[in-house]
Amino acid sequence: VGSEMCIRDSYGPDPHRYFCGSPYDDESFGCYAPVIREALEKIIGAEYTVTDETGMTTDELVEKYIDQGMPVIYWACINMRDPIVGPQWKLLDTGETFTWISNEHCMLLVGYDEDSYYFNDPYENNGCIRYPKTVVEDRHKAQHMQAVGVVRKTVIQ
């Protein structure tokens, strides 16, 4: 039997549609912005708008949200570790090959100063943590520049 007979394709969920694994398992992968947007829309109520802001730069997110007093859900790498090209699998829905970028993590971008961005990060009870701007922007790009914003709808009287 040739070795090609032993190779099997791995299939898995699309992180744009599902959480890959369990949020309670350290070995799980995670999910991407559309999943968080959809979950928030189900629970947040009619007075807020939830927007997938994937593709926006950190500067654009700061201007649109932070400067207006609203935090933004922000994808980067856990503890700003280097991104690592992770495992690949075929998506169950499409058969397309997907490559996970390991060290994926999302947290809440809450502020900035001249040199740093500030995040509320639940990982290991980090609390409010500061990272250098250049590192943050690099890690955000590595995770496909994903973000989710939430704003209160304006009521016209």
Predicted features and spans:
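Extracytoplasmic
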Residues: 69, 102-104
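Short, small-residue-biased leader/transition segments that mark boundaries at the very start
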Residues: 1-7
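...with weaker cross-activation on analogous glycine-rich loops/strands in unrelated enzymes
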Residues: 54-77, 81
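Structural recognition of the beta-strand scaffold that forms the well-ordered cores
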Residues: 49-51, 71-76, 108, 118-120
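Loop/turn elements at helix/coil->beta-strand transitions in domains of secreted/extracellular proteins
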Residues: 43-47, 67-73, 113-116
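Second-shell loop/turn segments in exported
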Residues: 19-30, 45-53, 62, 95-96, ...
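Extracytoplasmic/secreted envelope proteins and their assembly/folding machinery
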Residues: 33, 37-41, 59, 63, ...
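Noncatalytic regulatory segments and standalone regulatory/sensor domains
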Residues: 82, 86-101, 110-157
